[in-house]
From Swiss-Prot:
Induction: Induced by salt and cold stresses. Induced by dehydration and methyl jasmonate. Keywords: DNA-binding, Nucleus, Transcription, Transcription regulation. The lineage of its organism: Eukaryota, Viridiplantae, Streptophyta, Embryophyta, Tracheophyta. This is NAC domain-containing protein 67. One of its GO terms (cellular component) is nucleus. PROSITE patterns: NAC.
Length: 276
């Protein structure tokens, strides 16, 4: 599928057309501007029609071999005789056969018949019990034979050097099938990618084991290292002004000044002394 898309992109790049243009030639344009030059050995105006032996392939394999197109595909192909001395073409394919339907239609160019258009339907299986499919082909051949096949005459298997074929699926089943195939491939790729990942059950969740913060706040840490001054009993005097101290002194008698002195140290008993 990727190769087919790449060929389409290459052909579109060679065409160098503005966005929005599509290749939808008429019957007359196909015969006059593509089939006639190719049968005469001249190059086609644009390289968007692949050359292959179409009758060696099943129709659903041909879109991958086309150079251009998404819903209809164009091919140049030789055509062989079914029998060496007959004029009937060999319509056998890889796993089935093409069966003509309806009458031949002339393709006019400048008021003259330049080619013949034939419609064919693909049957899967062997004739006459093949199963009809939705694959349709329009085959264009020149009204006047020429080239090496005509020169070979009777007895040669080659009936036409080149005919031009337009292939499409009546119900567009091929495009739907390709869309389903791409979806399945995408799902398979996603599943394969998922299998290569580490199962979530084996993934250690770092959030389940948060790192412990052993650091202390800066202020608390500094306070813990610095020695602390013990509170003194006369610290309350340090906060008083001179006027307050003078006023306090005038109120107190000399014998009461002892209250301003610090209390006597507590008498301590030596360790091990008996308790009475």
């Amino acid at each position: 599928m990727a190769a087919a898309k790449r060929r389409v992109r290459d052909a579109e790049a060679d065409l160098n057309l503005p966005p929005g243009f599509r290749f939808h030639p008429t019957d007359e344009e196909l015969v006059a501007h593509y089939l006639c030059p190719r049968a005469a050995g001249r190059a086609a105006p644009v390289p968007i029609i692949a050359e292959l032996d179409l009758y060696r392939h099943d129709p659903w394999d041909l879109p991958h071999r086309a150079l251009f197109g998404r819903r209809e595909w164009y091919f140049f192909t030789p055509r062989d005789r079914k029998y060496p001395n007959g004029s009937r073409p060999n319509r056998a394919a890889a796993s089935g056969y093409w069966k003509a339907t309806g009458a031949d239609k002339p393709v006019l160019h400048n008021g003259r018949t330049a080619g013949i258009k034939k419609a064919l339907v693909f049957y899967h299986g062997k004739p006459p019990r093949g199963v009809k499919t939705e694959w349709i082909m329009h085959e264009y051949r020149l009204a006047k034979k020429g080239g090496a096949a005509a020169a070979a005459g009777a007895g040669a298997l080659r009936l036409d050097d080149w005919v031009l074929c337009r292939l499409y699926n009546k119900k567009n089943e091929w495009e739907k099938m390709q869309s389903r195939k791409e979806e399945e491939e995408a799902m398979a790729a996603a599943q394969s990618w998922g299998e290569t990942r580490t199962p979530e059950s084996e993934v250690v969740d770092s959030d389940a084991f948060p790192e412990m913060d052993y650091s202390l706040p800066a202020a608390s840490f500094d306070d813990a290292l610095l020695p602390k001054e013990e509170a003194r009993d006369d610290d309350w005097l340090m906060g008083m002004s001179l006027d307050d101290l003078q006023g306090l002194g005038s109120l107190l008698q000399a014998d009461d000044l002892s209250m301003l002195a610090p209390p006597p140290a507590a008498k301590t008993e030596p360790l091990g002394a008996p308790f009475f």
